[in-house]
A protein has these predicted regions:
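Juxtamembrane loop-helix boundary motifs flanking transmembrane segments in multi-pass membrane proteins
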Residues: 2-14, 58-66, 95
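Juxtamembrane loop-transmembrane helix junctions in multi-pass integral membrane proteins
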Residues: 26, 59-62, 129-132
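A generic, lipid-embedded transmembrane alpha helix
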Residues: 41-47, 114-119
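Transmembrane alpha-helix/helix-exit interface in multi-pass inner-membrane proteins
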Residues: 43-53, 78-84
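Membrane-helix boundary elements
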Residues: 47-72
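Hydrophobic alpha-helical transmembrane segments and adjacent short intramembrane/lumenal linkers
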Residues: 65-74, 80-159
Length: 159
């Protein structure tokens, strides 16, 4: 299936989708692509807010803000790999039987599935600025991500 169709399906059947992705065979480039899609769309979701901030405070240009955000997101790549390994090790302590690859698949796919919410959050944040509504939306998105990740990790670890 297409990536977008799988993302939509993951919101109502995350275990089935991650099972299908795992059954398609082990492919590190595919898993890295999921992480890259997340990072790219995270960058896109930040752009409207950074544009607003550049208009409100022209001391730092939009290009400088975008460059900093892009470098910051790229710097997170090793962190996500470590987070996936930690998730796998915790699952292993709880009786999981998967491999480190399965932990990466679960985390990176859950991150990719959270991108529609991130894009919406970025849009709202660019219109409203920071405030309680944006904080509440961010918290809701975080809870949705944790739910997706825990269900997917549980599936790939065989629990």
């Amino acid at each position: 299936m297409a990536l977008t169709s799988d993302i939509v399906e993951s919101w109502h059947s995350p275990r089935r989708v991650v099972r299908r992705l795992r059954g398609a065979g082990r492919s590190e480039p595919v898993v890295f692509t999921f992480l890259f899609v997340f990072l790219l769309l995270a960058f896109v979701s930040l752009a409207p807010y950074l544009s607003r901030q550049a208009a409100l405070n022209p001391d730092v240009t939009l290009y400088q803000r975008l460059f900093g955000a892009g470098l910051g997101l790229l710097a997170l790549v090793p962190f996500f790999y470590l987070l996936a390994a930690l998730g796998h090790l915790v699952a292993r302590l709880m009786g999981g039987t998967g491999a480190f690859y399965d932990g990466r698949l679960a985390l990176f796919w859950a991150l990719a599935c959270s991108t529609p919410g991130m894009l919406f959050l970025g849009l709202v944040r660019s219109f409203m600025g920071d405030g309680p509504a944006v904080t509440g939306m961010g918290l809701g998105l975080f809870v949705a991500f944790i739910t997706l990740y825990s269900l997917m990790l549980r599936e790939v670890e065989g629990q």
